[in-house]
């Protein structure tokens, strides 16, 4: 196990966060320790951000980042990625990878081509990638914003949920709080497949977390009944 020497700042948790952490499914010390970049950690500190990260609980998993309310989120999270050493892939429409230069650039950044003709196809492709990574005992994490947009919508898109359930991997909850200027990657849970119970847990963990534009934060619930559910994943 290689421990990080990036100088990640682990701050004291509030009383509410201590209660929430007591209900998570994975606890430090985590199995996967990463090597971050000290310069990126220094930049975050100089910008006033406090970062808490103690590793990942498994070699495969899904990270969701909430709330996504501003284009600035990308900049902050990019420095977070460099500071922690987290290498995470992201989903992109498969046709984009057929464009010569763009496709190569997307793969360099960690893009994974998925079919978006149906949500079942996208989730099925993602689950298959996780299954292959498990067979190969290969590191593979996917990161995404569950809303899929920085604008307020009635709920979260179901792709992350059905992928995590279908692949049976840990779900990491990244809390991006502009009010406190904190980034916490300390909560990892197992989804049960019971949407009501799982989203109640998600609401508890993200309670009080404020985005850059709080009015744009989408409620923590799945979008309407027209969105395919977790049990459609085979």
Model-derived features with residue positions:
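Extreme N-terminal tail/first-helix region
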Residues: 7-49
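Extended interaction regions within the primary functional domain
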Residues: 9-13, 34, 46, 56, ...
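Detector for Asparagine
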Residues: 15, 71, 98, 213-216
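Soluble catalytic domains of membrane acyltransferases
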Residues: 26-29, 45, 49-208, 221-226
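Charged phosphate-binding loop/patch that engages nucleotide di/tri-phosphates or the phosphate backbone
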Residues: 208-234
